[in-house]
Amino acid sequence: MSVMFDPDTAIYPFPPKPTPLSIDEKAYYREKIKRLLKERNAVMVAHYYTDPEIQQLAEETGGCISDSLEMARFGAKHPASTLLVAGVRFMGETAKILSPEKTILMPTLQVECSLDLGCPVEEFNAFCDAHPDRTVVVYANTSAAVKARADWVVTSSIAVELIDHLDSLGEKIIWAPDKHLGRYVQKQTGGDILCWQGACIVHDEFKTQALTRLQEEYPDAAILVHPESPQAIVDMADAVGSTSQLIAAAKALPHQRLIVATDRGIFYKMQQAVPDKELLEAPTAGEGATCRSCAHCPWMAMNGLQAIAEALEQEGSNHEVHVDERLRERALVPLNRMLDFAATLRG
């Protein structure tokens, strides 16, 4: 019998915070990046959780700001020969898997994800080997090696629909790596799901008691929650969904005040969508406690202007994403299944 890797006992040392830039330095790097993007026939693909100034730059240069599913779609279809991925490492790997002919650059290759780190491929392979009768579904927040072992890759925006589909076929599921999202999907679908026990270091920190106090302070506010959050937080939500779904919910809900339980990087695009509404961060620190992530992924914060400029300017392995070709071919199969399934949902 396999022994599951225990993410709760793993230590994820946070990267050092980037050195703040002056106003003049920011202006210098912004202009430099714009010039280099044109010179390299490159386009920026940025996640909602990157810092606002990075998202703004992606907008201004014709790039993409989105969740991981749309990032994958956009990068594969865009004619640029180089993709600058502002996000975390698995997003760069996914871009390379889908677009092997393109040069994939990242501000740094040290941008990790606690869900990815919490699902080592050797332990995960052993876990799957112990349950050969189950269909393996892995979240996009995993390494190329873990994706290569999977039958399906999925993002939070289509997780419920996919598991509902597989359940209708009578399939039993291994779900990895996020235990909270897995529990949410199981509750929504009633599927037979065996969960890996990983968690996002941002969403796992949201605290029920502190959120209750904030709700009491603002009783007219709606609560928006990402399903990577603990079940008790999800149970308090007026809307639950992926990043793009939460932005849509912010627009659809009649409330003028919204408490948002996800990475605060989302506030940039959410505030654009609802400029007249007040957005409040859900608390990540309990009574007498301090937060580690404080509602912002420390690795997402590594996607700074200076690092992006260096990635575009410097050639070499410090910034370019590579995926072994045999591994890429194996990981491409479940990724294409995800994209094909998502296309059927869009009609």
Curated annotation (Swiss-Prot):
Pathway: Cofactor biosynthesis; NAD(+) biosynthesis; quinolinate from iminoaspartate: step 1/1. Belongs to the quinolinate synthase family. Type 1 subfamily. It is an enzyme of class 2 (transferase). It catalyses: iminosuccinate + dihydroxyacetone phosphate = quinolinate + phosphate + 2 H2O + H(+). GO terms for molecular function: 4 iron, 4 sulfur cluster binding; metal ion binding; quinolinate synthetase A activity. InterPro entries: NadA, NadA_sf, Quinolinate_synth_A_type1. Coiled coil: none annotated. Its cofactor is [4Fe-4S] cluster. Signal peptide: none annotated. One of its GO terms (cellular component) is cytosol. Its main location: cytoplasm. Pfam families: NadA. This is Quinolinate synthase. GO terms for biological process: 'de novo' NAD biosynthetic process from L-aspartate. Binds 1 [4Fe-4S] cluster per subunit. Iminosuccinate binds at residues 47, 68, 139-141, 156, 226-228, 243. [4Fe-4S] cluster binds at residues 113, 200, 297. Gene3D superfamilies: NadA-like. Keywords: 4Fe-4S, Cytoplasm, Iron, Iron-sulfur, Metal-binding, Pyridine nucleotide biosynthesis, Transferase.
